[in-house]
Amino acid sequence: MNQVLITTRIDQFLGQPTAKTFAQLQRNLHASRSENTSAEELGELNRMLGLGDYSGVLSKSDELFDRWCLSPRFHYLRGQAALQLGDEQAAAEARALSQECLYWLCESGDGTFESPYRVTYRSDETDILMAFNLRKRNQMLVAGPNGRLDVVTMHDGVEIWFDVENAL
C-alpha cells in the first residue's frame, strides 16, 4: 500500500472525522497489512509506560502512528505518557483521538450478527467492551456470510459480534 495514500487518508480523517473518512482509512490500513502491524507493538508501548519510560512511549508511538492511527488504545497510551510528562495539551489531543476512534468504531455496526462492529485491530474489541463496561465470559471465532466474525458472550448471556475478517 502506498504510504502517501495512507498519510493522505489520515489527514482527511483528522481534518474531517466522518464515517466515510474513517471507513476509507480503515480499508487502506487493512490493505497495507503486509507492513507487519503487530499487537506486540501495543504491548511494547504498554510495557514502556509501566516502566515509566514516558519519553520512549512518545518517541516509539511517533514511529508507529501511521500503522496504529485508528486504535483507541494507542492514543490512550500516548495520552498517558504525555500526561506523565506534564504535557496537558498533547494528553488532551490524544484523549480526543482515542474517543474519536472509539466513537467511529461503535458507529461501524451495532454489535449484532447482522451488523457487527468492524474492527481495525484485534485490540479494538477489548476497547469497545471496556467502553460499555462489559465483561466477557467467552469468545469464539466463527465463519460469517462475509468472512470471519468474533462473537463475545458476556456474563449475562448477551452476545457482541465483531467483524474481524481484516483485523490487523
PLM features: residue spans?
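TPR/TPR-like (Sel1-like) alpha-helical repeat modules
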Residues: 83-106
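Short coil turns that delineate tetratricopeptide repeat
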Residues: 68-70, 102-103
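Helix-start (N-cap) detector for alpha-helical repeat units in TPR-like alpha-solenoids
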Residues: 38, 72-73
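Heptad-repeat amphipathic alpha-helical coiled-coil interaction surface used
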Residues: 58, 78-79, 98
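TPR repeat positional signature
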Residues: 41, 75-78
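N-terminal alpha-helical interaction modules that lie
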Residues: 1-62, 101-105, 112-168
